[in-house]
Amino acid sequence: SSSFCQDITLAVGESRVEFRTEIDWHELHRLLKVSFPTILYGEYGINEMQFGYVERPMHRSRAYEKERFEVCNHRYSAVCDGGNGFAVLNDCKYGISMEDGALELTLLRAGACPDMQADNRIHTFTYGAAAWNGSFQESDVVKQGYEINVPPLVINGITDTFSLADTGSDHIVIEAVKLAEDGSGDLIFRLYECKKRIDSTAVKINLPVKAAWLCDMLENKEEEVSVTDGAVIMDFRAFEIKTVRIELK
């Protein structure tokens, strides 16, 4: 009794296949999943979580793993054998099963409790698939996960290009930028390391920077950091989160 329409697209120059999906869902006691079987052997699968990822077994040899129907993921889940990798991306579907190289994303369910009609309506969502050569750290999966969730905005009237900041690294992510709560006009940047690596990076701020500090969650200054030619120099541990306060000239 359900129907769906799906546009499958592969953009020029991209390695990501997107599945833009609309489903008119009218089911009971049903679960809809999409399966991507692969021939990759990876002992552990990778599931994104906030500010990083967690590795979980791709097998069910232990009792608690056999009872685990699916696990949580955010923007992506991936399997990699060291030389090749495959990832499933999504914009709003957070349950996934992983076993023997297969990634199975849960799209819809039709439970009876507490509301038998809870999901009986039209659903619109997008998921994607991407493959690459090399290790997970060499891939652009994190970037593609952001692209499928935060598409660029098109604004009329602006002809020049401008980037507020650039990390100069494929594994340091600027998660948020805001004005300081104290009304000083300072900028607050939230950054994190996304690929379980240790590195030093120079975050280029394309505004006149006077000084920069590491700060706490309440935006209180804790430690001044070096600024060279408008670039803020910082060291990151694996999955480290940093909040930086930028004072402009």
Where are these regions (language model features)?
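C-terminal (or distal) subdomains of carbohydrate-active enzymes
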Residues: 1-249
